[in-house]
């Protein structure tokens, strides 16, 4: 007998606003999910804020339509669909929710609340792994 993965369906009414937004993107970006890396990989990480001089606007709304949140929001290259969860060495788990003009290849931007945090972070090569 083949084991089939059990799938849990969460009623839409119980989903958070963010999860509803990401569910819409999941359908549109379904073709990307099968090509995600399964092994750890090196990212060239930098940090950004929601300041108008960095993003062209200051409302904190990401390309996926979700409001930025520190210790959660990543700007990822287009190869990573919105909602992809990525564990980053020494930093924790994040979710791809945004894009950026310079975010291509192995570059990832980590959202931080303040410019001083972002400048202090600088640019680092870190090990990352897709966890969903």
Show which residues each predicted segment covers:
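Solvent-exposed, well-ordered loop and adjacent helix/strand elements within mature globular domains
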Residues: 1-132
């Amino acid at each position: 007998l083949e084991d089939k993965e059990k799938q849990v369906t969460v009623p839409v009414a119980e989903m958070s606003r963010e999860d509803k937004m990401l569910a819409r993107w999941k359908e549109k970006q379904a073709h990307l999910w099968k090509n995600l890396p399964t092994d750890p990989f090196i990212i060239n990480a930098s940090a950004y804020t929601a300041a108008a001089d960095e993003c062209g606007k200051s409302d904190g709304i990401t390309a996926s339509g979700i409001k930025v949140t520190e210790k959660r929001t990543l700007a990822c290259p287009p190869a990573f669909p919105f909602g992809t969860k990525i564990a980053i060495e020494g930093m924790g788990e994040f979710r791809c929710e945004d894009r950026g003009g310079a975010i291509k290849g192995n570059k990832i931007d980590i959202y931080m609340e303040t410019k001083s945090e972002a400048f202090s972070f600088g640019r680092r090569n870190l090990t990352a792994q897709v966890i969903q």
